[in-house]
């Protein structure tokens, strides 16, 4: 049983590493991660949530949005479209909506405040 727990943890850790290094891929998804590490998507979904306390897609969103905050601060001249694309969003509106939902402020306002 302990081996099983270790193997589960390892799969989740490999998933996390993959997400953190490839979050900018537009096609990043539960299915892509599952295929990459060679497990069934619903199995990965279950073990990921147990281990991390949130769904894989929520983890991906958080990873992308944390990166967006960095970019908005470090590259004040980049457009929201450029930033959205560089973190894996093909739709700038969806990116802005998610950002505002998570941080309570729009990315453009966040970027503006950093410029002052």
What is each model feature region?
Residues 1-2, 16-28, 48-52, 69-78, ...:
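Basic, amphipathic alpha-helical hairpins
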Residues 1-11, 30:
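Hydrophobic, helix-rich cores of sensory/ligand-binding and other regulatory modules
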Residues 9-14, 54:
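Short helix-coil-helix linker/hinge
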Residues 31-60, 84-106:
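Basic/polar phosphate-binding segments, predominantly the helix-turn-helix DNA-binding elements
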Residues 50-90, 112-116:
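Terminal helix-turn-helix DNA-binding modules in bacterial transcription factors
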């Amino acid at each position: 049983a302990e081996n099983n727990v270790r193997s589960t943890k390892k799969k989740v850790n490999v998933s996390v590493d993959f997400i953190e290094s490839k979050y900018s891929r537009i096609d990043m998804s539960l299915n892509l991660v599952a295929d990459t590490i060679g497990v069934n998507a619903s199995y990965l979904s279950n073990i990921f949530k147990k281990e991390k306390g949130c769904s894989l897609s929520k983890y991906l969103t958080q990873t992308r949005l944390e990166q967006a905050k960095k970019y908005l601060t470090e590259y004040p001249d980049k457009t929201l479209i450029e930033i959205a694309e560089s973190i894996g969003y093909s739709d700038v509106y969806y990116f802005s909506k998610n950002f505002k939902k998570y941080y309570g402020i729009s990315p453009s306002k966040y970027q503006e405040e950093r410029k002052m």
